[in-house]
């Protein structure tokens, strides 16, 4: 159960903002064939990788971007190519590959100055330490990252370091310290800073306060996340589909809040709202959360047969996806609930 909570908390914010559309990718690939080997071509490759980031084509195009960027001595795009490799391997929990690309990325970033991306990459690496229960190593590395960010006056690095500290504390059952670190990350967020970073921190805060049964704080952060999302989509309407998973998350955790405060009908309305964001491309963890909240709703109104059916669906998805994609044993709340109804 502990590792499942960590997976939920650490995965938010890493797959944001890019709709995976074959049409957009095909159009850019056609354009790529006609472009000269200059920065325009590098920019187009970069755009293709963002679309293809969740499949193996990401690695193929990132390799091409790295080779062509190095040939042109373009440290910016070489740094980004390393970052995309890191993100791909992080999402597959491949610790050695992440470590290899951190080593390759750092000297490139020292030339390009893309420290925000580097600190994001370090966050991936440290969160994998936490996920594999190397908590003291994660805390030590997060403190090193915090000092490095302080030395070069990088806000993104400071925020990421506190996020990592929070995850490590929570993983080792130091919940109060974890919440304190996460609230420090929240305090450090610039008022008009990167919306994706704010969404990531708020999502973690919502997850943690829900697990701690702190309903008042959970509602506060849910309302802020909703406001941030709405403003971001108004300013960037073309990215709405790419943020569908975050909308699902927000509606599901509103439902948790209302179930925890004995308001099942309001919870149900948010579960229904979340349904419209589900697609075949929805990240599997969000699908699990969707079916799990339905089970909890039916438990709350004592319709145990329906609850059991949704728990079965949740268990099937966990067995199929988590053991395959994350190499995890199945120890979940859904399993405990299923035993209760058996």
Residue ranges: model-predicted function:
Residues 4-13:
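Sec-dependent N-terminal signal peptides
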Residues 17-342:
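A "functional boundary" signal
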